[in-house]
Amino acid sequence: LSGGRFIVGLGASGPQVVEGWHGVPYGKPVTRTKEYIQIMRKIFEREGPVEFDGQMYQMPNRSEGTTGLGKPLKSILAAASDIPIYTASITPAGLRCAGEVADGVFPVWMDPNKYDVLGESIEQGFEKAGNDKSLEDFDVAPFVTVAMNDDLDAAYDALRPWLALYIGGMGA
């Protein structure tokens, strides 16, 4: 449909948003992200009904409070099995996760002069993946916020609300 121009982007968010807005425990964000990506890939592949038994997700869900009627299902929608999945992270654990299971990462406010700080964690994820993954087949796509103004202070002022939201409103 998109001619290969679609990318799935996932982020673990932060405890204030996950617990305050979504109403679920923040728990283990890296484990949750890895499992979610594994499940998405199974759905995209459409090789059969999806079953998954992870720490965070079970499909079908047989936990307390369920009816027991759930059964493994196969998506009725045909999607490209190779849709790229990127994660958004700047934490070492999140970057290792991206290197291990994702096709790319969206580092928020990445300083290009400090790539080595991010790169080390990403490459540790490549090693954990154990499949010869490298920067040749992995995208680092920084999230960049731009404010153009001849007055440098006014440009900074335009960015302050975004920084406050992401750092104070979503962070912990």
What are these regions (language model features)?
Residues L1-A172:
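Active-site-adjacent structural elements that line small-molecule/cofactor binding pockets in enzymes
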